[in-house]
Amino acid sequence: MKQMSVVADSPVHSSSSDDFVAFLDNELGASSPDSSPDKEAESQDELESVRIKRRKIESIDETEGSTSEGIIKQNLEASVEVDVCTHPGSFGSMCIRCGQKLDGESGVTFGYIHKGLRLHEEEISRLRNTDMKSLLGHKKLYFVLDLDHTLLNSTLLAHLSSEESYLLNQTDSLADVSKGSLFKLEHMHMMTKLRPFVRSFLKEASKMFEMYIYTMGDRPYALEMAKLLDPQGEYFNAKVISRDDGTQKHQKGLDVVLGQESAVLILDDTEHAWMKHKDNLILMERYHFFASSCRQFGFNCKSLAELRNDEDETDGALAKILRVLKQVHCTFFNKHQDDLVDRDVRQVLSSVRSKVLGGCVIIFSRIFHGALPSLRKMAEQLGATCLTEVDPSVTHVVATDAGTEKSWWAVKENKFLVHPRWIEAANYFWEKQPEENFIIKKKQ
Amino acid sequence: MFFHIVLERNMQLHPRYFGRNLRDNLVSKLMKDVEGTCSGRHGFVVAVTGIENIGKGLIRDGTGFVTFPVKYQCVVFRPFKGEILEAVVTMVNKMGFFAEAGPVQIFVSNHLIPDDMEFQSGDMPNYTTSDGSVKIQKDSEVRLKIIGTRVDATEIFCIGTIKDDFLGVINDPATV
């Protein structure tokens, strides 16, 4: 009881070491009253017998001393722990470090890793820092992937158009998902088509990145899709984030990703989901395999499924993006000798991006006002120079109509006259597209 | 720790079960109701082992349901602070690892893993000592000490540590 009270008091004192020494002396003295100094004054005659006796007593003292010391130490440790423990996180409302029950929910939830797990900001940044070092040591970066329209396309069975119903007979077996690409998920009333090249894409990307899935779908859907993409659980093990795990509604954020923002690449088809992390984003051309998906985005054209067509396996969007990833990865790790930790993948990404349309001088002609600023920004990010007045240095005139003054000028001066889609395509594929595919037809 | 204790419960039974098999019905319903549940006081009910006594039923007005007070013996499992448990690792990540001992979910954070063990990422994430002699990965069996417990209606959460003498891996699946 005495010890307890001392320990309870100890936090009050600012410097506890002196107190502790006094306390220790006191305790040790109290526990070994037999070894008092007057024993030293025994006469020489009795030395022999006393020595034996002393030895006995000493050995008792020693054990007593060490046990009481042990108790003190333990108590001290406990008290220090209670004082020092910053409660870096919680699991089932208990501190993950000291086991103490914590009331009130604070920190960021990491439900996608394990139910009931929460971590505090400092702990997250500590984990990010330590992880960063080992990751860079393995020459890897982080990669956050979206599911729908990026890696695959899903539709409700009820939304299949009549021209698509033939697909029902062509679905692949769920017994070995690693071979197929079209799956019917009866219990979810859904059909899912994986984007061509996705398996090679993930395999290649996993060598360069630690990968996360981040989807706006709900958790059961996200896990089901992860199972289709990664049946062995080798890429996305406990790294599947769904909308239930995000911290903000209708937004995706890197706060739940345990990776430093300067080392994260994102692949998504929806730019506005990543308002805070646009610099990390690689925008993906949407994959619309099913008609319901086309309708959802307001396209009236036939779906790939209706046309019985699909993206190219070796030269589709994913294959093109993989080349960009390889380039970014290579640039990041091969850059001159500055410290790896100080490098920022966002800078690498923007420098790679700015070479796409490098050397192009663009002038816009009669582009719809609402679309102009974003188009101009896109072109500038891709490295093109945008002018407002006609100039001999202009290489491309971007217009939707061949009848404008600038369009005439382009034809006369033998400059490229292209549709705005030329810029958009370059933005998606990270490659200057052949201009002849984007020629504007004369209006009748 | 396991305990063999006597608990009591009021069982509501639908009139359709009245008849010759009333007792059997009552017992099977009891098992269905309580086995696998948790209570903060007693822990996880592993199995009903016997019926001590079934009291007189009370017919409820209006519904015809009958309430029987049932005293039953059962085996319960409850982890305690300071208890040493053996558990199977279910997940390893940079924050630490999760392990299971029956219904109990235990988290051992990397603060409570010995400092000489380092996290190794990859398709089989693990914690390994610098000389590679000890490895904790999924399906490893570990001996750990409980430093905190919380019992919910259906789950028991524990915080564990292996930063102490004689704790850690007891059976490594990789070497078997």
Swiss-Prot record, chain B:
InterPro entries: NA-bd_OB-fold, RNA_pol_Rpb7-like_N_sf, Rpb7-like, Rpb7-like_N, S1_domain
Keyword Transcription: yes
Annotated Gene Ontology cellular component terms: P-body; RNA polymerase II, core complex
Top-rank lineage group of the source organism: Eukaryota
GO molecular function, one term: translation initiation factor binding
Annotated GO biological process: nuclear-transcribed mRNA catabolic process; positive regulation of nuclear-transcribed mRNA poly(A) tail shortening; positive regulation of translational initiation; transcription initiation at RNA polymerase II promoter
Pfam families with a match to the protein in the record: S1, SHS2_Rpb7-N
Function: DNA-dependent RNA polymerase catalyzes the transcription of DNA into RNA using the four ribonucleoside triphosphates as substrates. Component of RNA polymerase II which synthesizes mRNA precursors and many functional non-coding RNAs. Pol II is the central component of the basal RNA polymerase II transcription machinery. It is composed of mobile elements that move relative to each other. RPB7 is part of a subcomplex with RPB4 that binds to a pocket formed by RPB1, RPB2 and RPB6 at the base of the clamp element.
Quaternary data: Component of the RNA polymerase II (Pol II) complex consisting of 12 subunits. RPB4 and RPB7 form a subcomplex that protrudes from the 10-subunit Pol II core complex.
Similarity-based family: Belongs to the eukaryotic RPB7/RPC8 RNA polymerase subunit family.
PANTHER family: DNA-DIRECTED RNA POLYMERASE II SUBUNIT RPB7, DNA-DIRECTED RNA POLYMERASE II, III
Protein name listed in UniProt: DNA-directed RNA polymerase II subunit RPB7
